Swiss-Prot record:
Family annotation (SUPFAM superfamilies): 6-phosphogluconate dehydrogenase C-terminal domain-like (SSF48179), ClpP/crotonase (SSF52096), NAD(P)-binding Rossmann-fold domains (SSF51735)
Catalytic residues, chain numbering: H450
Any one cellular-component term (Gene Ontology): fatty acid beta-oxidation multienzyme complex
Origin species: Escherichia coli (strain SMS-3-5 / SECEC)
Gene symbol of the encoding locus: fadB
Similarity annotation: In the N-terminal section; belongs to the enoyl-CoA hydratase/isomerase family. In the C-terminal section; belongs to the 3-hydroxyacyl-CoA dehydrogenase family.
Function according to Swiss-Prot or TrEMBL: Involved in the aerobic and anaerobic degradation of long-chain fatty acids via beta-oxidation cycle. Catalyzes the formation of 3-oxoacyl-CoA from enoyl-CoA via L-3-hydroxyacyl-CoA. It can also use D-3-hydroxyacyl-CoA and cis-3-enoyl-CoA as substrate.
Quaternary structure (record): Heterotetramer of two alpha chains (FadB) and two beta chains (FadA).
Protein name listed in UniProt: Fatty acid oxidation complex subunit alpha
Length: 729
């Protein structure tokens, strides 16, 4: 053994060839600060070996290196810029020394090589991969950019266009694509990986492969003519501006850095990468996006822990076909759980099957499946007008009309047709689960399962625990949702549960602004362009359906009369009374016409201004700051109440539910992350300016207490220990 660290070791293989093996405790390898330091020590040992002829890098895990240790990021981001820059220089010196070894090097890459893992193998001369490879640089999705030389080496290896596509979008690619663009040199079966890598290494040692020529382009300026450079970088900057926008500075910073570094050799180019990385790491956007990653891991880990002792349902059923039922049936079947889809008429069943077939055909068109797979999936969805097969199902989700009487009748009837241990769930969006449970003989086997539309796209499923829902019931439904590829978050019961309960105060803030003379077009523009929502409130209401919102608004008002009962006729009432239901009938705040792809395109409609004039004061202008404050305060206050009342368990789950269920702008990180970034004291000062607008603007007492001590909702993060304490030489 040449070297043994906590996460890697170095040993001789044969005839002057050494192997450097990543083998961290636990299930995966991460390139954390300790591993980088250990890698530097191992390379120091290699540099002393006069008889070294070649080096093989490999992993003892199912994945090569999954990336940097993101749990370290928030504390690293608090380190002063100078110290962070110093540590990055040290880390890059380690990879440079790996790249500069006077012998050929190869990485045998299995599974994932992401972020720092990808940057590590870019420093070797050759890369051989297995078919399950996923390799790339996802850093821009975390609000930063590659910091271990990825923005320098990848463009020089692949060419600017291929590298920009991966780096700016934070993409990873599979084995075939990686081979095609030159990111790996070959792909072999897993059992042949080491043998194949050794064969390449021997060829390089024997002079059959020119490893020095392979290495040289990574040390030099990027080979691009002035015209090629102008075209590549102009197109990349245009694409990034269009897709990422101003709220995500990392992608455009990465592109500009690669452009600026193109004319330099490795050392100067790495210095530019360092200078760009450090300021990005100190942005609120980076902290928010890293926070989302960590919250996502937490939520998924919680679901895994919850379901460790239950069997995932093997057969499911959906009550109520149509678009929603068809979407749920498709998602279940697509992920391998056969489903019976029941309705009371053929027309609805046809609609449900058509929806499932449409979604499968899209997969076929994209080349994700072939005709055989399509036929196989669709054959596991069984449409029926009766209860045939219900005696074999493990879980049933009801997705009929949003009417408590109808839902109770359907659920009570279904309970008589299934096994005593079958779990029933309701896809209601607002009706309390404990109220629906009153119709059942076995309420312990019942809970809520709130999907979001469109089912195949929206990652969140709210799992609602009723007063009598058993732990086993919740666990089974969480297991099914996870199997369907969704992110389940368990919440406690109340009208609207969590997501809709906090959404309708936001809509109420919108209605009050319109009542006071604001223009809905400006509100939408501000909430989209300035705050960052994917849709402004008017557009969102049109997509949700004005009729749906009108009904849900009444349910929420009955559930929370003190805050959500309004004493005036609002814009939603006016549009509903005029039969303007949104996209579903082509008339809402906007008029909708289908574009060439069959998607609804919004157009101005002057009739709306006349309708709104009946329920609004004369038009007046509002500042962007006031619009954002009046829209967000009711939502954030309600989010805080949900935490205080135990409707949602943690700030992390609340923020993920908002991001995954409502499209809360990820660069804000969710309501609690936004609140912490703003500061509770500053938020309280802002909210108090609007408390005269009514109970929705009254800040909960718990938040007032936080503000008095300026406490955050997330646990405070300590800066990483001074970088000088790490090995930096």
């Amino acid at each position: 053994m040449l070297y043994k660290g906590d996460t890697l070791y170095l040993d001789w293989l044969e005839d002057g060839i050494a192997e450097l093996v990543f083998d961290a405790p636990g299930s995966v390898n991460k390139l954390d600060t300790a591993t980088v330091a250990s890698l530097g020590e191992a390379i120091g040992v290699l540099e002393q070996q006069s008889d070294l002829k070649g080096l093989l890098l490999r992993s003892n895990k199912a994945a090569f290196i999954v990336g940097a240790d993101i749990t370290e990021f928030l504390s690293l981001f608090l380190v002063p810029e100078e110290q962070l820059s110093q540590w990055l220089h040290f880390a890059n010196s380690v990879f440079n020394r790996l790249e500069d070894l006077p012998v050929p090097t190869i990485a045998a890459v299995n599974g994932y090589a992401l972020g720092g893992g990808c940057e590590c193998v870019l420093a070797t001369d050759y890369r051989l991969a297995t078919p399950d490879l996923r390799i790339g640089l996802p850093e821009t999705k975390l609000g930063i950019m590659p910091g271990f030389g990825g923005s320098v080496r990848m463009p020089r290896m692949l060419g600017a266009d291929s590298a920009l596509e991966i780096i700016a979008a934070g993409k990873d690619v599979g084995a075939d694509q990686a081979l095609k663009i030159g990111l790996v040199d070959g792909v072999v079966k897993a059992e042949k990986l080491i043998e194949g890598a050794m064969a390449i290494l021997r060829q390089a040692i024997n002079g059959d492969l020119d490893w020095k020529a392979k290495r040289q382009p990574k040390l030099e300026p990027l080979k691009l003519s002035e015209i090629e450079a102008t075209m590549s970088f102009t197109i990349a900057k245009g694409m990034v501006a269009q897709t990422a926008g101003k709220h995500y500075p990392a992608p455009i910073t990465a592109v500009k850095t690669i452009e600026a570094a193109a004319r330099f050799g490795r050392e100067e180019a790495l210095n530019l990468e360092n200078k760009s990385f450090v300021p990005l790491a100190h942005t609120n956007e980076a902290r928010a996006l890293v926070g989302i990653f960590l919250n996502d891991q937490y939520v998924k880990g919680k679901a895994k822990k919850l379901t460790k002792d239950v069997e995932t349902p093997k057969q499911a059923a959906v009550l109520g076909a149509g678009i929603m039922g068809g979407g749920i049936a498709y998602q279940s079947a697509w992920k391998g759980v056969p489903v019976v889809m029941k309705d009371i008429n053929d027309k609805s069943l046809t609609l449900g099957m058509t929806e499932a077939a449409k979604l499968l055909n899209k997969q076929l068109e994209r080349g994700k499946i072939d005709g055989l797979k399509l036929a196989g999936v669709i054959s596991t969805i069984h449409p029926t007008l009766d209860y045939a097969g219900f005696d074999r199902v493990d879980v049933v989700v009801e997705a009929v009309v949003e009417n408590p009487k109808v839902k109770k009748a359907v659920l009570a009837e279904t309970e008589q047709k299934v096994r005593p241990d079958t779990v029933l769930a309701s896809n209601t969006s607002t009706i309390p689960i404990s109220e629906l449970a009153n119709a059942l003989e076995r309420p312990e086997n019942f809970c809520g399962m709130h999907f979001f539309n469109p089912v195949h796209r929206m990652p969140l499923v709210e799992i609602i625990r009723g007063e009598k829902s058993s732990d086993e019931t919740i666990a089974k439904v969480v297991a099914w949702a996870s199997k369907m590829g969704k992110t389940p978050i368990v919440v406690n019961d109340c009208p609207g549960f969590f997501v809709n309960r906090v959404l309708f105060p936001y809509f109420a803030g919108f209605s009050q602004l319109l009542r006071d003379g604001a223009d809905f077009r400006k509100i939408d523009k501000v909430m989209e362009k300035q705050f960052g929502w994917p849709m402004g409130p008017a557009y969102l209401l049109d997509v949700v359906g004005i009729d749906t919102a009108h009904h849900a608004q009444a349910v929420m008002a009955a559930g929370f009369p003190q805050r959500m009962q309004k004493d005036y006729r609002d814009a939603i009432d006016a549009l509903f009374d005029a039969n303007r239901f949104g996209q579903k009938n082509g008339l809402g705040f906007w008029r909708y016409k289908e574009d060439s792809k069959g998607k609804p395109k919004k157009e101005e409609d002057a009739v709306v201004d006349d309708l709104l004039a009946e329920v609004s004061q004369p038009k007046r202008d509002f500042s962007e700051e006031e619009i954002i404050a009046r829209m967000m305060i009711p939502m954030v206050n309600e989010v805080v109440r949900c935490l205080e009342e135990g409707i949602i368990a943690t700030p992390a789950e609340a923020d993920m539910a908002l991001v995954y269920g409502l499209g809360f702008p990820p660069f804000h990180g969710g309501a609690f992350r936004w609140l912490d970034t703003l500061g509770s004291a500053k938020y309280l000062d802002m909210a108090q300016q609007y408390q005269h607008l009514g109970p929705l603007y009254e800040v909960p007492e718990g938040l007032r207490n936080k503000a008095r001590h300026n406490e955050p909702y997330y646990p405070p993060v300590e800066p990483a220990r001074p970088v000088g304490d790490l090995k930096t030489a």
